[in-house]
Swiss-Prot record:
Pfam families: SAM_2. SUPFAM superfamilies: SAM/Pointed domain (SSF47769). InterPro entries: Neurabin-like (IPR043446), SAM (IPR001660), SAM/pointed_sf (IPR013761). This is Sterile alpha motif domain-containing protein 14. Transmembrane segments: none annotated. Residues 326-389 form the SAM domain. It comes from Homo sapiens (Human). One of its GO terms (cellular component) is postsynaptic density.
Length: 417
């Protein structure tokens, strides 16, 4: 009982609400403000509207000072809630001494905080706005002149920081990456894209060159391919992936094009001209993995040591015969290029040449041994393409002949005049 009686006056004397006023919470509020400023540094860049709102809230906090030192709470920052009865009076020394604390506190906060990211350049603006309201709230009107927050120099410095942040916020780009490897990856990706474009251009130019030099023999094409493989970049694509659909010669498949299945996608003009270049004495027997049956086996083995220069010069001198001038041997080579070498013997026995080949229909193909409907459809499609290409070539030759005739007439008229 005695102890309880003693505790009652002790509790009355040392009541926390009376002995420790609200000013004891100033430290926790400052820590909260510092934590909020650190959290603001990790957020997105402030927009113009947010900057205007912060500036207007700071001006409202300055203009709301009454003669009695009462301040209306303009914004929700914890620094604006730092009022206490200690500095409510205009003449109290505690109020005057507390008036000089916020600038030093702001400087210490700015000096202690290392900038974690480029976004922290907006932090002084929020600091200035918050501490400006704090200075206006804590200082009395006579004592507010020495404060650096309410001085004209700070007011002049504050609008300078605001246009800078507005200029920076004018950027519509996303926040800068913290790691330089992201930008490096974008640059390298762009370089690789440009490299792919140049490689595609190089491959198309290479296919054009191969189309122009389709009269070269397989030996010369093999030498060109070997030199390109030795000095080329490892990023170069294989030519049979890019050129097979365009109908150009496959430099990767240097084996005999008459036996390669990759040549099924050739254009008719290309296939017609390519078979015409493959003469009997050009291809060595080692270059063909499949040994065809028929009269071509002896012809291919007749000159196994034919040099590259002789074969290339020889084919450069000879003109390319069109499909109408194909022989039965060239028809057999064309069948081998379509992987239909099993029918080559029947075609050779019946002496089917180029003009007869273009006149073949379904019944004639059946009589030649093409019992498979898929093989007949393939041959019909290729024959149709070759006929269209031959017609196109004939029209182009006629047009060129007409143009030459016109030029000759103009020259004659110019000489007469």
């Amino acid at each position: 009982m005695a102890s309880s009686k003693l505790r009652e006056p002790v509790d009355e004397v040392f009541d926390l609400d009376l002995a420790v006023p609200e000013t004891a919470r100033l430290d926790s509020s400052l820590h909260k403000a510092r934590a909020q400023l650190l959290a603001k540094g990790r957020r997105h860049r402030p927009s113009r509207s947010r900057l205007r709102d912060s500036a207007s809230s700071a001006e409202d906090g300055e203009g709301s000072d009454g003669p009695g030192g009462k301040v209306t709470d303009g914004c929700g920052s914890p620094l604006h809630r730092l009022r206490s009865p200690l500095h409510s009076g205009p003449g109290s020394p505690a109020g005057g001494s507390f008036c000089l604390d916020p600038p030093g506190l702001r400087r210490s906060l700015d000096e202690d905080e290392p900038p974690p990211s480029p976004l922290t350049r907006y932090r002084p603006l929020h600091n200035a706005a918050s501490h400006e309201g704090l200075a206006a709230a804590s200082c009395s009107p006579p004592r507010s002149a020495p404060s650096s927050d309410s001085s004209p120099s700070f007011v002049r410095r504050h609008p300078r920081a605001e246009p800078h942040s507005e200029d920076d916020s004018r950027d519509a780009s996303p926040p800068e990456p913290a790691s330089p490897t992201i930008g490096l990856d974008k640059k390298t990706r762009r370089k690789f894209l440009d490299l792919g474009v140049t490689l595609r251009r190089a491959s198309t130019g290479k296919s054009r060159k191969e189309k122009g030099s389709n009269r070269l023999s397989m030996g010369s094409r093999e030498s060109v391919e070997g030199s390109g493989r030795s000095g080329g970049s490892p990023f170069l694509p294989f030519s049979w992936f890019t050129d097979s659909g365009k109908g150009s010669a496959s430099s990767g498949s240097t084996t005999s094009p008459t036996c390669s299945p990759k040549h099924e996608g050739f254009s008719p003009k290309k296939s017609a001209s390519q078979e015409s270049t493959l003469s009997d004495d050009s291809t060595p027997p080692s270059s063909s993995p499949k040994i065809p049956s028929g009269p071509w086996q002896e012809a291919k083995c007749s000159y196994p040591y034919h040099t590259l220069s002789q074969s290339s010069d020889e084919f450069l001198d000879e003109p390319l015969p069109p499909v109408h001038h194909w022989t039965s041997q060239q028809v057999g080579q064309w069948l081998q290029s379509l992987n239909l070498e099993q029918y080559a013997a029947e075609f050779a026995a019946r002496q089917v040449d180029g003009p007869q080949l273009l006149q073949l229909d379904g019944s004639k193909l059946k009589s030649l041994g093409l019992s498979n409907s898929h093989d007949r459809a393939l041959v019909k499609r290729k024959l149709k393409e070759m006929a269209a290409a031959a017609e196109k070539e004939r029209k182009a030759q006629e047009k060129a002949a007409r143009q030459r005739e016109k030029l000759r007439r103009r020259e004659q008229e110019a000489k007469k005049s």
